[in-house]
Design a protein with these regions (language model features):
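Structural signal for membrane-spanning alpha-helices in multi-pass inner-membrane proteins
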Residues: 4, 38-42, 83, 87, ...
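Membrane-embedded alpha-helical segments of multi-pass membrane proteins
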Residues: 29-33, 124, 174-181
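Active-site-flanking alpha-helical
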Residues: 137-146, 174, 206
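Juxtamembrane helix-loop-helix connectors linking adjacent transmembrane helices
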Residues: 7-27, 48-130, 148, 216-218
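Functionally important transmembrane alpha-helices
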Residues: 153-218
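Structural signal for the C-terminal ends of transmembrane alpha-helices
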Residues: 8, 40-49, 185-189
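Selective recognition of hydrophobic, aromatic-rich stretches within alpha-helical transmembrane segments
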Residues: 21-46
């Protein structure tokens, strides 16, 4: 999602073609490289080769697929509820202070474009590329580096804060920090695969809500 946020910022006020180019330039190189790295590490992990253990793809022993799916559903519902409460609190606070909050960059970009190809790319990014690339980058990469030098009580919130700030808008930071903390918690206890699935499920539900909102507009 960070790539889409940055692309939206770059494409604000531009035509559809410029928005598309900005989106592609900001989004695809970072995410494709990260997904390529993910595939290499996954192959190494399955083969028991060096560096493969860095991925941490597998869930802890003793958890069945059914148990993981049940946990995924509960985690998704909990994350939806928590982020909704935080978002509403931010909106109420901004309203009380007389501050007008702008729509997220990706929301404005998709609403202004109306391009099926742009919507398709955004959907692919949000539900596949972003979960894979961002979980590898933040939950394994950045958190692994920080945890090597700092206590976990500092490494985890710092990783979540970096995850939030990369998405580009100040008023979304509290919500995104909560998402980052939740994904790190899931990753450490249930493996990277579960964190990726939760990230993808959450993003897909947000895109669905956005689509319903756009369709409901006159």
């Amino acid at each position: 999602m960070a790539g889409m946020a940055l692309a939206g910022r770059a494409g604000g006020g531009l035509g559809e073609r410029s928005a598309w180019q900005s989106l592609a330039l900001a989004l695809l190189p970072m995410q494709v490289c990260a997904v390529g790295t993910f595939v290499v590490l996954l192959r190494r992990e399955r083969a028991g080769r060096p560096w493969g253990a860095l991925l941490g793809w597998r869930a802890p022993a003793g958890l069945t697929t059914r148990q993981l799916l049940c946990r995924l559903g509960l985690e998704w519902l909990t994350l939806l509820a928590v982020t909704l409460l935080i978002s509403q609190a931010v909106m109420w606070g901004a309203r009380a202070l007389g501050v007008e909050l702008e729509a997220q960059h990706v929301v404005r970009l998709l609403q202004a474009s109306g391009s099926p190809s742009l919507v398709a790319l955004a959907t692919l990014s949000a539900t596949v590329l972003a979960p894979l690339s961002e979980e590898l980058l933040f939950r394994r990469g950045l958190h692994g580096v920080l945890a090597w030098r700092l206590p976990a009580r500092l490494a985890t919130p710092l990783t979540a804060l970096c995850f939030a700030l990369l998405h580009g808008q100040l008023h979304t930071v509290p919500t995104l920090v909560a998402i980052g903390l939740a994904l790190q918690w899931v990753c450490q206890r249930e493996g990277l695969r579960q964190a990726i699935l939760l990230h993808a499920t959450y993003n897909a539900s947000q895109l669905l809500l956005l689509a319903l909102t756009v369709l409901a507009e006159p």
